[in-house]
Amino acid sequence: MVTKNTANNANNALNILPEAANTAVDNDEKYLSFALVLAITIMDNLVKLIGTDGFVLYTYTLQDTATARAVFNELARRLKNFNRQEEVYTTDSLTFRMKYIYGVTLFEHDSKSILNLFDKKGYPVLSESGEPGSLDDMYLDIQARLHGGYASKKFLHLHEHCLLSAHVTPSVEKTQRGILIKVGRKLVSFIHVDDESHKTDIFKSVVNVIKS
C-alpha cells in the first residue's frame, strides 16, 4: 500500500536527484554518470555511490532515514535501468554491478557475520555485516550467480566460504593458527584450524584447487 508519507518521500527523492535518469549526481558540487558507479549503499541517512575502484564517489546526506531510503531505492532503480545488459544485484542496503565482482567470502568476527566482495585486483570493494548466520543465503546466492554466469573469470571454490577468480592469482599459506588465503599481501580469507593434521588437509585441498 502506498501511503501519503511514502509518496512524499518518493517526491522528495526525485527533487533531490538529477532529472536525467542516466546521471547519478548533478549539483553545484559534482557531476557523475552512472557509467562510473559500481555500487550504491545506504546507512542511516547516508546514501553513498561507490566507484568501480571501490572508493566513494559521492555521498548524499539526507534529512532523515525515510528520505534516504527513497533516494536509495530510486538510485538503485536508475542503476539497473542504465545497465540493462548487466546483472545488478540488490539487497536492503546494497546495490551493485556483478560484472565487477571477482570474489566473495564470508566469515565471522566479533560475533558478526561479514561478507566481502572483491574486485579483479583482489581488493575488498564492498562488504555487508549482520548477525551470525544472517548472510548465509546471500553468500550462497552470490556464489551461485558468479559460478553460473561468469565462466570467463574462472572462479575457484577455495573453501566453503571463499570463491575467488583465478585471474586475481591467489596464494595460500599455512600458519600456526590456520590457513591464510591472500592476493599479494592482501588477506582475502582465513580458516582457523588448531589440529595440525586437519590443517594440512585443508592446505592441500586449497592448493589443489588453485593448481587445477
Where are these regions (language model features)?
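Asparagine/serine/threonine-enriched low-complexity, disordered tracts
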Residues: N5-N15, N22-D26, T52
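Residues that recognize and position ribonucleotide moieties
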Residues: K30
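Acidic, Ser/Thr- and proline-rich intrinsically disordered linker/docking segments
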Residues: L46, I50-D92, Y100, V104-I114, ...
